[in-house]
C-alpha cells in the first residue's frame, strides 16, 4: 500500500511573538518543520503534503524539496479543516500519516511502530501515558479496551479526567475512510472549528478497531508554542544526541553543555569538553580531543588531533596528529596536513599548511600554499588582496619566515629559504637564500627625549 504524509504547518504561533512563522523557529539550528520533513522522508513515502497558511512565502523560501506538495489553508479553522484541504490530493488505497510541523523530535522508529500497529485497520493513533495529563485530550476506551473517542480537557467529566492516556494528535488512516470522515466534520462547537479528533468517534461508531502505539519517550511528541517550550525542545534534542554519542564511545565532559546543530560522526576514544558547538556535517577521527568553547562547522578532523580551547573551524580539513589553537581560526578552504600546527591568534583562509609545518602565533595566511616542515614566525602576514583581486603566496619545504614579516602576493619563497624578521617581501626568494627587506637601523648618540614646556 502506498504511503502519504501530511504535515500541518499553517499556524501563526502568536505566543512566539515573532514575525517568523512558528514552524520556522529553529531547534539545533534547523527549522522545526524541517526536522519533521526529514523524519517523514525516512519512511520513503510516495507523497508529502505540506499545509501552509501564515507566512507561506517565508515557508516556501526556507524549505525546499521536489518531493513536497504545497497545500494552502487560507483560513485557519481547526486541524480538521487543515486536513480537509488535502482531500483533492488523496488517492484511493493509501495510508495517510498526519504530522505537525512544530513537533520536531518525533523519530522514525516511533512512526514505524504506528504504521505497524495499524497495518490491518483503517485508523491508528499515537498516544502517550502521562503521570500528569492536564491539558491533553484523553483517550476514552470501553470495557473491552477499545478506543471509542477522544475527549478534550475542558469537556471531560471527573472520571475522564482521571484517564492518563492522552492524544498526541498524530495519526494514520486509510485514505478512503479519511476522506469520508473529513467530509462529515462539523464546526458545531464553541470555537466554531473543525476538529480532526472528531473522526475517532466516527470510526468507533462504524465498529472500526482503532489501533494505538506509543513513543519511546514523551519528549518526542512535545511541541513548541512559545520560546520557553522551544528552549526545552532544544535541550531535549541535545541531550538525545549526547546520549547517542556516549553510547558510541565518545567522552563528553558535561553532556548538559554540548551542542550539535547538524550531524556529528566521531571515531573511537574521542573527548569533547564543555561548550563545544558542532554545526553542519562534522567528522572527528579516532582519539580527537576538542577543548572547551570551540565551534566546528562542516569540517573533517583527523586522528589524534587536538583542537585547543576557543578555536573556530569552518569548512576546513585537518589531518592526523595536528594541533590547532587555542584561539585559532580556520576559515573556508583551510587545510592542515599531518602533524601541522596552528597556534593562538592564527587565521587561515584558502590556505594549506604542509606536513609538520608550524604557524604558532599571531599570523594570517590567506591564499597561501606552505610546504612541509616550514616555520612561519609570529606576526607574519600574507598580503593577498590588492583591493580588487586575490593573489597566491607560495612557501617551500623547510622555509623559515622571521617574525613580523609581510609577504606581498603574488610571491614565492623557495625551499629552505629564510626571510629575516621584519621584512616586507615583494619579490621571489630562491631556494636556500636569505632575504632581508627592512630599513637600516640607525643609532643616534646623545639624543634626548623632548621636554615638557611648562605653562603651555
From Swiss-Prot:
Pfam families for the chain: Hexapep (PF00132), NTP_transf_3 (PF12804)
Region (Pyrophosphorylase): 1-227
Catalytic EC class: transferase
Cofactor stoichiometry and binding remark: Binds 1 Mg(2+) ion per subunit.
Keywords: Acyltransferase, Cell shape, Cell wall biogenesis/degradation, Cytoplasm, Magnesium, Metal-binding, Multifunctional enzyme, Nucleotidyltransferase, Peptidoglycan synthesis, Repeat, Transferase
EC nos: 2.7.7.23, 2.3.1.157
PROSITE patterns, alphabetized: HEXAPEP_TRANSFERASES
Binding site for UDP-N-acetyl-alpha-D-glucosamine: 8-11, 22, 73, 78-79, 100-102, 137, 152, 167, 225, 331, 349, 364, 375
Role this protein plays: Catalyzes the last two sequential reactions in the de novo biosynthetic pathway for UDP-N-acetylglucosamine (UDP-GlcNAc). The C-terminal domain catalyzes the transfer of acetyl group from acetyl coenzyme A to glucosamine-1-phosphate (GlcN-1-P) to produce N-acetylglucosamine-1-phosphate (GlcNAc-1-P), which is converted into UDP-GlcNAc by the transfer of uridine 5-monophosphate (from uridine 5-triphosphate), a reaction catalyzed by the N-terminal domain.
Subunit structure comment from the entry: Homotrimer.
Similarity section: In the N-terminal section; belongs to the N-acetylglucosamine-1-phosphate uridyltransferase family.
Protein name: Bifunctional protein GlmU
Lineage: Bacteria, Pseudomonadati, Pseudomonadota, Gammaproteobacteria, Alteromonadales
